[in-house]
């Protein structure tokens, strides 16, 4: 069974990242590699995590012309990752091209999910980039576009999960960042929830970074989270 917990490796160097990885169990959590760490360490670091039998979510949020995104998704799949993502705002043709690029992998292909609205966005900010929808409206609209394109699911704030499930179906995967423990500050995330709240809303996978990576005892935090989930 795939763990519900995805630990975000938000580090700026390999030593610190691997020190945390050494304390984690691939049976208990997946790992997320984002733009900072991938830019610094590249594909070899991802391959090392896969070699250690972790499921890896490669969080690079591809957004470009359809052909470029398709090739990027194919290259990501070659690394053996479990999940990759693209920006839903790239449009239907881009999403379809990304999906088609993974067909050759058959049942071994990575999950392909789309980013709806970043959890750092606050109500009203969409208008500054020319979008008149509210946050829930925009997230739901993009989720439905991703479903139409044949993607497996979306990245979405827990606040939008329930309506996305209603519109796109219970089997449509929701990956939820912006998860904070009750005693944590929001940091630069605006729309946050605790793990228990997010699961109640219907989130399938929870992405948790700083509450684990900045903890004095990360293993203890992970164990407590798993007990709660």
Curated annotation (Swiss-Prot):
Substrate binds at residues 10, 32, 59-68, 119, 180, 189, 209-210. Pathway: Pyrimidine metabolism; UMP biosynthesis via de novo pathway; UMP from orotate: step 2/2. Transmembrane segments: none annotated. SMART domains: OMPdecase (SM00934). Pfam families: OMPdecase. It comes from the Bacteria. Its EC number is 4.1.1.23. GO terms for biological process: 'de novo' pyrimidine nucleobase biosynthetic process; 'de novo' UMP biosynthetic process. GO terms for molecular function: orotidine-5'-phosphate decarboxylase activity. Coiled coil: none annotated. The active site is at residue 61. GO terms for cellular component: cytosol. Keywords: Decarboxylase, Lyase, Pyrimidine biosynthesis. SUPFAM superfamilies: Ribulose-phoshate binding barrel. It catalyses: orotidine 5'-phosphate + H(+) = UMP + CO2. Homodimer. Belongs to the OMP decarboxylase family. Type 1 subfamily. Catalyzes the decarboxylation of orotidine 5'-monophosphate (OMP) to uridine 5'-monophosphate (UMP). This is Orotidine 5'-phosphate decarboxylase.
């Amino acid at each position: 069974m795939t763990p519900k917990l995805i630990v975000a490796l938000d580090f700026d160097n390999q030593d610190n990242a691997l020190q945390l990885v050494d304390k984690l169990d691939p049976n208990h959590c997946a790992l997320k590699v984002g733009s900072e760490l991938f830019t610094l360490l590249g594909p070899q670091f991802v391959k090392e995590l896969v070699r250690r039998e972790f499921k890896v979510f490669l969080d690079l949020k591809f957004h470009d012309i359809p052909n470029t995104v398709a090739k990027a998704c194919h290259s990501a799949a070659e690394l053996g990752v479990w999940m990759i993502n693209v920006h839903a705002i790239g449009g239907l043709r881009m999403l379809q091209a990304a999906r088609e690029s993974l067909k050759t992998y058959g049942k071994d292909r990575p999950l392909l999910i789309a980013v709806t609205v970043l959890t750092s966005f606050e109500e009203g900010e969409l208008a500054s980039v020319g979008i008149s929808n509210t946050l829930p409206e925009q997230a739901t609209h993009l989720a439905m576009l991703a479903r139409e394109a044949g993607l497996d699911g979306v990245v979405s704030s827990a606040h939008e999960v329930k309506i996305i499930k209603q519109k796109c179906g219970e089997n449509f995967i929701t990956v939820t960042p912006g998860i904070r423990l009750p005693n944590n500050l929001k940091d630069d995330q605006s729309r946050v929830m605790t793990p228990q709240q997010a699961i109640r809303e219907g989130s399938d996978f929870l992405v948790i970074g700083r509450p684990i990576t900045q903890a004095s005892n990360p293993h203890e935090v992970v164990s407590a989270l798993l007990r709660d989930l």
